[in-house]
Design a protein with these regions (language model features):
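Terminal targeting signals and extreme-terminal segments of soluble enzymes
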Residues: 1-141
Length: 141
C-alpha cells in the first residue's frame, strides 16, 4: 500500500461525498494489506416494505467496499475501477442495528480484481455473502 491506514480511510471517506455511499451512511472503518471494512446502519432508510434490510442496499454496500478496496492496489492518477459483475446470497435478515462489509481479495490481476465481501452483523452473524469483479481501466478510457 502506498499510504498509511489513516490516509487510506480518509481517502475512502472523501470518495463517498455526495454519492450513494453518503446517502446510505456507509463508513470505511478498517483497512489491511488485502482487505477493507465498511459499516452501514440498518434503519428504515434501507428497509424493504417488510421492514427488513433491503437486498439492494446490501449489494450497494458490498460493491462500494469492494470497489474502494480495488483502489488500494492501483495508481489512481493513471487508472480507475469499474464493477463489472456482482452476485449476492442473502442468508439472514436484519431489522435494525449495523452491518459490516469485509472485502477480501481473491484474485488481484493486472486488469481484473475479484473480491469476496462478507456482510455481517454486530454479533458476526453472516447476513450476506457477495462476490464482486472489478476491471481496472486506464483513465479516460
Amino acid at each position: 500500500m502506498k499510504l498509511n491506514k489513516e490516509k487510506i480511510l480518509q481517502f475512502s471517506k472523501k470518495l463517498s461525498e455526495n454519492t450513494l455511499m453518503e446517502t446510505l451512511n456507509i463508513e470505511y472503518i478498517e483497512v489491511g494489506e488485502d482487505y477493507l471494512v465498511a459499516k452501514m446502519p440498518v434503519n428504515p432508510k434501507v428497509h424493504q416494505p417488510m421492514g427488513l434490510l433491503h437486498g439492494g442496499a446490501t449489494v450497494a454496500l458490498a460493491e462500494s467496499v469492494g470497489s474502494a478496496a480495488s483502489l488500494l492496489f492501483i495508481d489512481t492518477d493513471k487508472f480507475e475501477v469499474r464493477g463489472i459483475e456482482i452476485s449476492a446470497n442473502h442468508l439472514k435478515s436484519k431489522r435494525e442495528g449495523v452491518v459490516y462489509a469485509t472485502a477480501k481479495i481473491i484474485h488481484k490481476g493486472k486488469t481484473i480484481h475479484l473480491w469476496q465481501i462478507k456482510i455481517t452483523d454486530e454479533e458476526d452473524n453472516l447476513i450476506s455473502l457477495c462476490k464482486l469483479t472489478n476491471i481496472v481501466l486506464p483513465k479516460n478510457a
